[in-house]
A protein has these predicted regions:
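Short, solvent-exposed loop/hinge segments that bridge or flank secondary-structure elements
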Residues: 31-65, 88-109
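Bacterial signal peptide processing site
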Residues: 25-28
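Bacterial N-terminal signal peptides that target proteins for export
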Residues: 2-14
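A short, structured loop/turn motif at beta-sheet edges
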Residues: 70-79, 104-110
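Generic short beta-strand segments
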Residues: 78-88, 116-118
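Surface-exposed, polar helix/loop patches in the mature regions of secreted/periplasmic/lumenal proteins
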Residues: 97-143
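Tryptophan-anchored aromatic micro-motifs
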Residues: 31-49, 81, 113, 140-158
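C-terminal motif of bacterial Sec signal peptides marking the signal peptidase cleavage site
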Residues: 20-23
Length: 159
């Protein structure tokens, strides 16, 4: 094999390696096939989220919010959905649940979200976050426990 031929093969191999490395280390989001935030428990620092078929429940520190159903993700991984929020949830719940928007982005198994709360009792807008939660990670909520768990219904065994 000539020296020139070996050089060409080396260049081709190097180009293939660099291309494969770049493809594997890409930061582009891989979105869920159904276009919805994946089901399960999500955890982060001072934050947690539970996603079930019927609701999404988000804790940020000692406050929490709810969205009906699962959150739909757009083609870029973003979302902006309406829900409700409880600004005073621990140690006891005080006040009504108020309207909120949840805005964020899903990248791989990490979701970043900000709650924009319309505090109708104080006539002001309150922002909680942004926080990041990761699917399957433990929540680090300190003294504020997550207050809801997804309801799993099992049918009784047939006899």
């Amino acid at each position: 094999m000539s020296r020139r031929h070996r050089f060409r093969l080396s260049v081709i191999a190097l180009t293939a390696f660099v291309g494969a490395f770049a493809a594997c280390s890409s930061t582009s989001a891989v979105l869920p096939a159904d276009g919805l935030v994946p089901l399960g428990n999500w955890g982060g620092d001072s934050s947690a989220m539970i996603v079930s078929d019927t609701a999404t429940h988000l804790h940020i520190a000692c406050t929490y919010g709810d969205v009906s159903g699962r959150i739909a993700i757009d083609a870029a991984g973003g979302f902006d959905v309406s829900g409700s929020y409880m600004l005073h949830a621990y140690p006891i719940t005080v006040g009504p649940s108020v309207p909120a928007r949840f805005v964020g982005h899903l990248s791989g198994s990490t979701l970043t979200v900000t709650a924009i709360v319309n505090d109708t009792t104080q006539h002001t807008t309150v922002t909680r976050g942004p926080v990041s939660v990761t699917l399957g990670a433990d929540a680090k909520l300190g003294p504020c426990p997550i207050c809801r768990r997804p309801v799993i219904t099992k049918l009784p065994a047939a006899h």
